[in-house]
Amino acid sequence: MATSAKASRIDILFDVYRENSIKNAERVNRELGKLEVKRVVGGQMIKQFSSLLSNGTNKMMLIRFLVSRWQTKYDCIGSTKVNVGFDETCISLNGSDVRDLQCNHEEADTRLVFHAKHISATFDKIVINTPDTDVLLIALGLSGEINGKLLIKTGVKNKARIISLESIKESLKTRYNIQDSDQASKALLGLHGFTGCDTISSFAGKGKIKPVKTMMKDEVYINLFASFGLEPELTENQFADIQKFVCELYGHKEEDTNKVRYKIYAAKHGHLDPKSIPPCADSLRQHSLRACYQVHIWIKSLESYPTIPSTVSFGWDQIEDGDFVSMLKMKS
């Protein structure tokens, strides 16, 4: 990659796989019945590569192995500066000082944007190569704090394309007739977390497009989701607006999802698809706490060592094995 890319600097970044994480449930599902290895050494043929990579421990061993090999092959890279971020460290393959790139981010998603900010101090064009929608929206939401032109490269071979974040902002202005595209970009990040991502459940049958359209036609909702996650705590005013937003998402001008649930139930005489009703207010509060927490982590992407509060207070409960599970209602 480094030899084929026409770039002066390339940063390669990896996830960190922690034992107690809100991402563990998703990872455990991928790891069930998969291959586990004890050591990665050179000269071994890996026959079940997808099974190998489904296990977080395997990934970390492979990453460390690759980095150790890359360090011995730096001469073939030429003048390109290559930095590699893994665990809580970052190394430069050519021996440059990269202490200011040390960080404790768990996900490569946030680390990519953290590095983009660093790169923007010396380069006016930054290309983030990723297929992940989370990264695009984190970069879009924080683009106002990053100098230079931010581009997202996604897809491979003939399907590869480069997306300009500035063009997305201009499109938001035109399509939704809004003036402040930075505010709308921040709102899209907040809404993305609220409507579902790797760690947060989604609203069945609602997708992403309808929530975006609902938000963009009301400045109250744009401001709500632009501020969503600035602090990990959810205020009562925010939750009141969230209830109104969710009611509208389900086609009702109400302020309480419990009332909407009853209205739909009564209109259908009890015969209804569970997907057609919003969550009750108690469950919605727990969902909102989790989403606010996740968006807060994204917003902190530009900090090397962000202070993130305990997960337990924000809609998750920690079970005996240390994993986190979503709470559906407040503990009595």
What residues fall within each predicted segment?
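Noncatalytic, typically N-terminal accessory segments of nucleic acid-processing enzymes
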Residues: 1-332
